[in-house]
């Protein structure tokens, strides 16, 4: 049978029929260890890197790498012994890091391909029961990881496809490499400048991802497909960029937002691991330079240095790859540091937990003070209870280990949310859990599922120094006010006039409200806590313009009648009735970035006329944030407007709203009319339009639904129905958990409709829902799978893949 070229693969992928399933025995062997006396550690029934089966990690890695190397070295009987043992016994890969177990699974597949003449049905059966489900689950959950994960997963997919001669699986691997909505796809991992998605993280992971992409290209080349050439030799640019930086040269760098939205704060190349060269550069060099005659000057220089290192015996034979250090290149100094701030005397502390932090490379643990906050936690049976939780805050760079010791009770399990962030809870004993952070997060540590006394962890990059902030204020012609660490009553909070920068030293606690009123050009920065005892308004912004609030922990912070307001690294926790977290009333150009809300009413709202503020609400954006609604909605749009205000003849508009990269940890609202994590309810003659929900992850709905989009007349709060809702997009919204309550889209009448609602990439428990999804009975509506009720006076609802 005639096989298709890559050009036809790309144009007519569905028609691939046969492949030249071969493996070059000339592939360089990474390790030169003598395997003739190797003793197998396994086989293991379950392989994992974390959790219950984590003890299988090292042994399974050694075994599967040994099988590949021995097959290449001609030690066929010993390779077959390992292959057959795992083919008979291995059932699955387990744990959060199961996709990374496909590193060794790839080695095993390559060994099996070399030894295919001795294959048995058990080989393919093992691949299909253990490897392919792990690949499928990763794709169902994607995108959520840095790109080396996706590249590693896809490398194993291609190796498995070649091993078992599955042309459809091979086609999927090529499609993923070129087009996947994951950081592990070539165009999402390597930019047109050569910068990699993980360049800003560190060089070990960037080279790991590049190496996996090179392996994919090598396997495809063995089948006659030239993935090296994809996107105008894009991978060559990534290899050259990496070689250039790791040899000590400067490189261009641009902060970008990756497809997960999680890894977008790196503003320079990651210096960790710089100059520690992984043996990944020879394969691409031989292809691009040796075969195609292209130029790779930095890679050429790197390989020349590598040969010298080999002659001097300076190359370390690692399990995953050989490595060596480039002479004269050192890691940067901006590495692992942690910054903790003692609580001031008089601040409300809580002693349920002892929390310790340790930067990577240090032997010392530092205790972090634990504050108390009240929440209105759900306790089941349509009930809530005011309870006390704990929270800590610290800053760090690089990596930091966190140890949490439960002082008052024993526990069996620990969960660290958002789940999507992938923070692994390593339970040390019945009172201690430990985990690693490699970038700042806002997290909830929950023991045995308890959310009534959990621990919140707020972390950030270190704030700007007092001296630098003062210099900036002076250059801007602003007044600079510095508040030193301490506990402050309401009367100690200064007035904040226009053209003021207020710097709160870490370790400041306030029991009053920072009132920004009728002002412009105001900044509150540093690290402070402002939590009045009644539970409302640690800060508010009224009738003001050009305002920045950065690094403040508070209860609530409404913004009314204002323009150009930014809240960054603000954390809101509330417990009383009507305890909305971050409300917007009749304001425009409001940005929320990296905020956290756990509130006793709506976490964030966008209203028009309300609370004495008149007018429309426009250009509201929230990104990179975490929302937890103990009551009501995480996001609520549109209810209030001019009909209930002093000028009921006016028509307000709520428009141009973007919510992106949001984790929603809870909705617990028993009243059906107030459910919907993503809720739009046009009232008071409002027109709500141009709304985008993008990359939203929802988990743990106690009582609630995914969405409500309505035009309604709620007589409790409104004087009239809304005018309508139009042009709303739900893009890459994902829910994982038990069956949610019924979502609703419903208009009011023929003059007050819902129009043009688009769903793109909607996933419910890993299943992508769209109008053409396979297996959907023709008589089913796509909405039934959510479940979603589409009522009357609704036009143009579409579900796209």
Task: Give residue ranges: language-model regions.
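Extracellular beta-rich repeat passengers
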Residues: 669-801
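Acidic/His metal-coordination segments adjacent to aromatic residues that form catalytic metal sites
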Residues: 86-93, 134-140, 183-203
């Amino acid at each position: 049978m005639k096989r298709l070229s890559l050009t036809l693969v790309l144009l007519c992928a569905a028609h691939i029929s046969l492949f030249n399933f071969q493996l070059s025995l000339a592939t360089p062997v990474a390790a030169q260890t003598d395997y003739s006396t190797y003793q197998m550690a396994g086989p293991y029934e379950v392989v994992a890197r974390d959790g219950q089966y984590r003890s299988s990690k090292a042994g399974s890695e050694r075994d599967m790498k040994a099988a590949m190397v021995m097959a290449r070295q001609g030690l066929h009987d010993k390779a077959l012994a390992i292959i057959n043992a795992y083919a008979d016994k291995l059932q699955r890969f387990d744990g959060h890091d199961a996709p990374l177990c496909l590193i060794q699974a790839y080695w095993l597949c390559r060994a099996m391909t070399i030894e295919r003449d001795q294959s048995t049905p058990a080989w393919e059966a093992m691949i299909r029961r253990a490897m392919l489900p792990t690949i499928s689950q990763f794709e169902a959950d994607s995108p959520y990881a840095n790109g080396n994960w996706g590249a590693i997963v896809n490398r194993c997919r291609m190796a498995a496809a070649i091993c078992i001669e599955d042309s459809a699986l091979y086609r999927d691997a090529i499609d993923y490499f070129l087009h996947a909505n994951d950081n592990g796809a070539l165009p999402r991992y390597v930019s047109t400048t050569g910068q990699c998605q993980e360049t800003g993280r560190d060089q070990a992971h960037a080279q790991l991802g590049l190496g996996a992409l090179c392996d994919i290209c090598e396997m495809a080349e063995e089948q006659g497909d030239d993935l090296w050439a994809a996107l105008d030799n894009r991978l060559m640019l990534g290899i050259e960029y990496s070689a250039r930086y790791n040899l000590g040269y400067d490189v261009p760098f641009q902060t970008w937002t990756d497809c997960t939205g999680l890894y977008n704060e790196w503003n320079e190349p990651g210096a960790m691991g710089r100059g520690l060269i992984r043996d990944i550069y020879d394969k691409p060099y031989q292809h691009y330079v040796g075969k195609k005659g292209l130029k790779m000057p930095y890679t050429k220089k790197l390989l020349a240095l590598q040969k010298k290192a080999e002659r001097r015996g300076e190359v370390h034979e690692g399990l995953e790859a050989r490595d060596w250090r480039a002479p004269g290149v050192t890691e940067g100094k901006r590495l692992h540091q942690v910054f903790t701030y003692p609580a001031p005397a008089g601040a409300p502390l809580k002693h349920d937990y002892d929390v310790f932090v340790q930067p990577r490379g240090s032997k010392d643990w530092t205790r972090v003070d634990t504050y108390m906050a009240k929440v209105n936690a759900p306790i089941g049976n349509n009930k809530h209870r005011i309870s006390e939780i704990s929270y800590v805050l610290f800053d760090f760079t690089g990596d930091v280990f966190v140890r949490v010791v439960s002082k008052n009770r024993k526990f069996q399990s620990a969960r660290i949310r958002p789940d999507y962030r992938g923070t692994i809870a390593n339970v040390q004993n019945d009172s201690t859990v430990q985990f690693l952070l490699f970038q700042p997060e806002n997290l909830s540590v929950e023991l045995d599922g308890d959310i009534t006394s959990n621990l919140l962890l707020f972390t950030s990059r270190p704030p700007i120094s007092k001296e630098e902030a003062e210099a900036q204020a002076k250059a801007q012609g602003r007044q600079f006010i510095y508040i030193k660490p301490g506990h402050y009553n309401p009367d100690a909070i200064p007035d904040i006039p226009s053209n003021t920068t207020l710097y709160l030293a870490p370790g400041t606690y306030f029991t009053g409200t920072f009132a920004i009123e009728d002002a412009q050009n105001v900044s509150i920065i540093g690290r402070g806590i402002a939590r009045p005892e009644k539970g409302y308004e640690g800060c508010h912004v009224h009738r003001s313009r050009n305002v920045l609030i950065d690094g403040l922990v508070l209860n609530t912070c409404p913004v009314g009648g204002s323009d150009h307001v930014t809240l960054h690294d603000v954390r809101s926790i509330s417990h009383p009735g009507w305890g909305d977290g971050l409300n917007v009333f009749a304001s425009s150009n409001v940005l929320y970035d990296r905020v956290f809300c756990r509130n006793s009413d709506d976490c964030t709202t966008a209203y028009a006329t309300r609370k004495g503020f008149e007018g429309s609400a426009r250009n509201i954006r929230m990104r990179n944030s975490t929302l937890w609604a103990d009551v009501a909605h995480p996001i609520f749009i549109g209810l209030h407007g001019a009909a209930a205000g002093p000028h009921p003849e006016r028509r307000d508009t709520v428009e141009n709203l973007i919510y992106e990269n949001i984790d929603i940890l809870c909705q617990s609202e028993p009243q059906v009319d107030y459910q919907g994590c993503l809720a739009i309810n046009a009232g008071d003659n409002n027109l709500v339009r141009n709304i985008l929900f993008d990359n939203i992850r929802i988990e743990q709905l106690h009582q609630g639904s995914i969405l409500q989009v309505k035009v309604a007349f709620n007589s409790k709060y409104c004087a009239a129905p809304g005018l309508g809702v139009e042009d709303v997009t739900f893009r890459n919204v994902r829910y994982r958990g038990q069956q949610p309550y019924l979502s609703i889209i419903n208009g009011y009448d023929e003059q007050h409709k819902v129009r043009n609602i688009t769903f793109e990439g909607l996933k419910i428990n890993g299943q992508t829902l769209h109008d053409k999804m396979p297996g959907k009975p023709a008589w089913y509506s796509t909405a039934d799978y959510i479940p979603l009720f589409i009522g009357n006076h609704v036009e143009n609802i579409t579900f796209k893949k």
